[in-house]
Structures are given as C-alpha cells and as structure tokens.
Amino acid sequence: MKKKNHKYRGKKLNRGESPNFSGQHLMHNKKLIEEIVDRANISIDDTVLELGAGKGALTTVLSQKAGKVLAVENDSKFVDILTRKTAQHSNTKIIHQDIMKIHLPKEKFVVVSNIPYAITTPIMKMLLNNPASGFQKGIIVMEKGAAKRFTSKFIKNSYVLAWRMWFDIGIVREISKEHFSPPPKVDSAMVRITRKKDAPLSHKHYIAFRGLAEYALKEPNIPLCVRLRGIFTPRQMKHLRKSLKINNEKTVGTLTENQWAVIFNTMTQYVMHHKWPRANKRKPGEI
C-alpha cells in the first residue's frame, strides 16, 4: 500500500481523487463488509445509495442483495475498477461524480457506505437536513469521534438535534483502523440511522424547529429557563417546566427529543409568531 501512496506525492489531484487526500480509507476485511451489508437488512425491494464506493468491495456485495445500487465515486481510477467489477450486475449504476454534487434519489432509498472522513458532516447534512426526503435508513462507517458527537446524550449542535427529531442515530460498534487501507489515524465506528416511525414533530415544521434549535443551543450548558426567557414569559416558562417535569437547573443540552417537541409545540401555540427565533439563512450551495 505504501507504493500506491507514493505515486500521489507531488501530483496535482482533483477533489476526492486520492484516498489520503479525500479522507477515504478503503475496507479490505471481507467479514466486516458482509457484516455491514447484513446489518443494513436490505432486500430486493430496496434502492441502495453507496457514497464513496472506492474499488467496489462493498458495492459487489450490495449488488447481490438490493434491487438497485447507485454507487457514487469521484476517483476516475476507481470508477474504471467499479465498472469492470459490476459489469455483470444490471441493477448497479456507477455515478462518476463528487459526492456533494449528486442529487439524492427521489424514491425511498437506503444508504450503505464507508464514507470519506473528510466530508463526514457535509454528507450527514445532505442526508438528514431534509426530513421530507426519501432517505429511510442507513449503515454508515465513519470516524469514531464524529459518530460519538452525533449520538451523544448531551447535544451541543443544533443540526444534530434537528436530525434526531426525525431519525434515530446510534453506534452499532467500533471498528479498528487495521481493517482499512490506508489505515486512518483514528478508529472508526459503524453507525445505524433509522427514520422514526412516530417522529415527535411533522417534517413540515423542520425550518421553524431549526430556528428554535439554533437559538437555544448557542449556549447548551446554561439552564433552559435562562436561555429561553427571550421567547417565553415567566408565567409561560413556569407552566413549561411543569409540563417537562424539570427543575430550574435543567440545561439546554440535556433535554430529550420529546421534551424539545413539547417546547416547540408550546411556542407555536402560545407565543406570538414574531417572537419565534428564525433559522440562519444558508448561503448558496451551503448545506
């Protein structure tokens, strides 16, 4: 593998072309690959999106299980290998494109991927920032630190809170760096994402809820009653605390998704619209 790394030195590369530069680390453990596909629990009825297909170690197994496989890869050399490996699988389409520039399938789809670590958060935002999309579930291998941030009981990031209102996110297990080529500097984790059957809020409230989440989580370590006093009156906050069954010291980052649903519903029902916090506007092309 070292010889392969050497050939990229001093060479000008497009985004995602080299595993080392893109943060892409290819899996080579067959048992691990089979475990990932098994845990994804896919069937002939599923459309599977693979982001960062690499040389096709995962793609070829997915092609035998799914009804349709959309394998995205930006490295021209890998695309050639993928094309040869999947030539006998008519259900598999190779998409030669930057992951962040693709259009997600309009139909319901599943994601099974070993994603490039360098763009972990942008990929998650692409998949989860629109709860009305066709994304249903996924098994994603990512950097362990990112996996822990996305699944922590203490929530610091507004986008993570928004994701978890509509999706369950959990770590299946950790994966040693020795299962990858080139091996990353950090360990990895297998993460399961599942759309909630009974989400606490309708997806039509996503933008309004994101505004509340961004406002509240600017200071996740302070008490909720202090952070939200710009929205609720003292009397409203008193009733809200009773509804949430919390004391005055309960901090913003420790609330559950169901508690956030109560806060949001209370705001929309009893607070004048002009007092609702607004979500930050995204720049063109920003996720």
From Swiss-Prot:
GO BP field: response to antibiotic
Gene3D superfamilies in the cross-refs: Ribosomal RNA adenine dimethylase-like, domain 2, Vaccinia Virus protein VP39
Biased composition (Basic residues): 1-13
Gene Ontology molecular function, alphabetical: RNA binding; rRNA (adenine-N6,N6-)-dimethyltransferase activity
EC number: 2.1.1.-
Sequence segments annotated as region (Disordered): 1-21
Record's keyword terms, sorted: Antibiotic resistance, Methyltransferase, RNA-binding, S-adenosyl-L-methionine, Transferase
Function: Involved in erythromycin resistance.
Family listed: Belongs to the class I-like SAM-binding methyltransferase superfamily. rRNA adenine N(6)-methyltransferase family.
Protein name: rRNA adenine N-6-methyltransferase
Taxon lineage: Bacteria, Bacillati, Bacillota, Bacilli, Bacillales
